[in-house]
Structures are given as C-alpha cells and as structure tokens.
Amino acid sequence: MKAAEFFQLPASLQPFASFFSPEVAPWEWLKTIGTALKAQDFSGGQAIPPGVYAEGQVYVHPSAQLPHTATLIGPVWVGPGTKLLPGCFLRGNVIVGANCTIGHNAELKNSLLMDNVQVPHRPYIGDSILGNGAHLGAGVVLSNLRLDQKPISVRLPSGVVDTGLRKFGAILGDKAEVGCNAVLNPGAVLGPRALVTPTVVLSGYVPPATIAHVRTTVHFVPRRD
C-alpha cells in the first residue's frame, strides 16, 4: 500500500515534496512532518493580528484568513486562501494546504492537510493525513492513541500491518468524507472517495468509493404518562 494510491501532494505544498515519498505507506508520512517543517523558511507570511496567539515558528500565507481568536503553536504552516475560524487550535507540526477551512474549536496536531480540505465544525485531528478535498462533518474525532497505549496496527484486506507508531489517527484519501459525530479509531484508513456515515465508530480500512454505515431501527411507542 503506497501513499500514491490515496493522494498526490498538491502544488501548494511542493516545498515539502522531498520529505513525502509517494512510494511509501501513507502513515510513514507522519514521521516526517516535523522534519519537513524544520527545513522550511518561515519568513514572508502575514503579520499575526491581536487576539491570535502565536508561539514558535508560524507561517500564514498572506492570502489566508485569520480569525479574531485562535492559537497557533509552531511549527505551523498555513497555505494560500485557507480560512481559520474562531477558536481553532493548531498545536505543533501542522501543515495545511491551499483553500482549506479549519473550523471553530478545531484542534490539530502533527497532521498534514492537503488542498481544499474542509473541517469546519469542532473536529479533533491528531496524527493524521487528509487528502485533497477531504471533508469532516461536525464533531468528528480522529482518535490517535489506543486505550492501552500500545503501538498501532492497520487492518487491511491483506493482513495486519504493525506501523510501529504509538500515535496515529487516520489516513483519508482524496475526497474521502466522514459524517457528523463519527469516531475513527486509531489507524483507520479511508481510500479516495470513501464515505463514513454520521455517528459511526470505525476501525480498519474502507476501500475507495465505498460507504461505511450502520443500519439502525428507530422504534416509536406511545407515552404512558
């Protein structure tokens, strides 16, 4: 399984291209986010306005939109045309491509978001890679740590792969989507255009262009009072 099967690094993130090989497993990219950021020139970004707390190395493209309140703990890199909404919290080793929306109260850490990613309403994105055009509904959690804190494995049709990672949230291929209040357990992998419906708790692999959903039945009974 190669990263090239899930996404292609967009033009907006070409300064990082040498650090993210399309030939390796996509979760291997998580190990190089910090290294890739250390190699960048953080000059030339827009001035951080009052109300936005910034610490460490932070680059925000001049065309990106900053809110009146946000917290950016570097290293953080925000690409052109991206919109950050009030209360978002980017805390270390975060790369965001062009024309994304990072929602109010969104929390991101050690993650790479490519172009046109939409995470507009209270998501948690930890140790994850989101491909071009990926979308998370309100309240989605990309959980990145097992309860027993053991290394995380990926369950694929070909077998179980030990990633060696203690923290690993999810891989979302290009245009993959996750519905409101769904939880992806550590090591979840979604192929391009895969879709997880609202409130699902998911582990493992969802093939490309496949819908993962749970069938439920709602029963109606008369009140007795």
What do these predicted ranges mean?
Residues 1-56, 193, 199, 208-210, ...:
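Terminal amphipathic alpha-helical/low-complexity segments used for targeting or macromolecular assembly
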Residues 18, 113, 119-225:
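Glycine-rich hexapeptide-repeat left-handed beta-helix
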Residues 42-44, 60-62, 173:
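Conserved short histidine dyad/triad with adjacent acidic residue
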Residues 45-46, 64, 82, 115-116:
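Short Cys/His-rich Zn2+-coordinating modules
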Residues 57-59, 77, 95, 129, ...:
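Residue-level "contact hotspot" at macromolecular interaction interfaces
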Residues 60-105:
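Glycine-rich active-site/cofactor-binding loop and its immediate structural neighborhood
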